[in-house]
């Protein structure tokens, strides 16, 4: 059996910060560069016999991340050189990912934090693009309302900021 076929059949256990263990296919877990590098560093045996602790991710968020990784398991593997311009400029999100990101704000931000921690750049991009689309075209007041942010600037401070950033406004 080829090495890739063996990897496809292997299972990996992930342990959330609340002690829950989720067992997934290794290829799914390796969508996370953190996990992929950990497996490479520790070797197959160590990881196959023990759950990988993820101290910054709780079970509901880990289940969502695993769901995303499962759906994207056949995507080309990410590389550290995946910093191309199209990724940075576009806020378009494919339909499945849009539906996946239709969660409450707390879950959305937890997914973004988990994607960052677990080094899953494509999921991090989808999360950040979702937030970008939520604020696109909105005034500061509308953004504050959307994210339940209290304005702690005095009117004088707001006016000074407005003057300093006048050049950036759409006209």
Swiss-Prot record:
Region called Interaction with the F-box domain of F-box proteins, residue ranges: 112-171
Domain of life: Eukaryota
InterPro entries attached to this UniProt entry: SKP1, SKP1-like, SKP1-like_dim_sf, SKP1/BTB/POZ_sf, Skp1_comp_dimer, Skp1_comp_POZ
GO CC annotation, single: cytoplasm
Entries under CDD domains matching the protein: BTB_POZ_SKP1
Any one GO molecular function term: ubiquitin protein ligase activity
Transmembrane stretches, start-end: none
Pfam family, one: Skp1
Keywords: Ubl conjugation pathway
Gene Ontology biological process terms in this record: exit from mitosis; G1/S transition of mitotic cell cycle; G2/M transition of mitotic cell cycle; kinetochore assembly; mitotic cell cycle; mitotic nuclear membrane biogenesis; negative regulation of cytoplasmic translation; negative regulation of mitotic metaphase/anaphase transition
Pathways per UniProt: Protein modification; protein ubiquitination
Binding partners and assembly: Component of the SCF (SKP1-CUL1-F-box protein) E3 ubiquitin ligase complexes. Interacts with scon-2.
Role: Essential component of the SCF (SKP1-CUL1-F-box protein) E3 ubiquitin ligase complexes, which mediate the ubiquitination and subsequent proteasomal degradation of target proteins. Controls sulfur metabolite repression, probably by mediating the inactivation or degradation of the metR transcription factor.
Family: Belongs to the SKP1 family.
Protein name, entry field: E3 ubiquitin ligase complex SCF subunit scon-3
Origin species: Neurospora crassa (strain ATCC 24698 / 74-OR23-1A / CBS 708.71 / DSM 1257 / FGSC 987)
Gene symbol of the encoding locus: scon-3
């Amino acid at each position: 059996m080829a090495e890739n076929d063996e990897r496809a059949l292997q299972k990996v256990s992930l342990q959330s910060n609340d002690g829950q263990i989720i067992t997934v296919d290794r290829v799914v877990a390796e969508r996370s560069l953190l996990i992929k590098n950990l497996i490479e560093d520790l070797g197959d045996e160590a990881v196959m016999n023990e759950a990988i602790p993820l101290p910054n991710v709780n079970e509901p968020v880990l289940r969502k991340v695993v769901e995303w990784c499962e759906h994207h398991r056949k995507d080309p593997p990410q590389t550290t050189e995946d910093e191309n311009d199209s990724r940075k400029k576009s806020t378009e999100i494919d339909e499945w990912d849009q539906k996946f990101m239709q969660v409450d704000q707390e879950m959305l931000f937890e997914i973004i934090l988990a994607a960052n921690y677990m080094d899953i750049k494509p999921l991090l991009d989808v999360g950040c693009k979702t937030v970008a689309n939520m604020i696109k075209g909105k005034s500061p007041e509308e953004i504050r309302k959307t994210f339940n942010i209290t304005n702690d600037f005095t009117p004088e401070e707001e006016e000074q900021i407005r003057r300093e950033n006048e050049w950036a406004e759409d006209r």
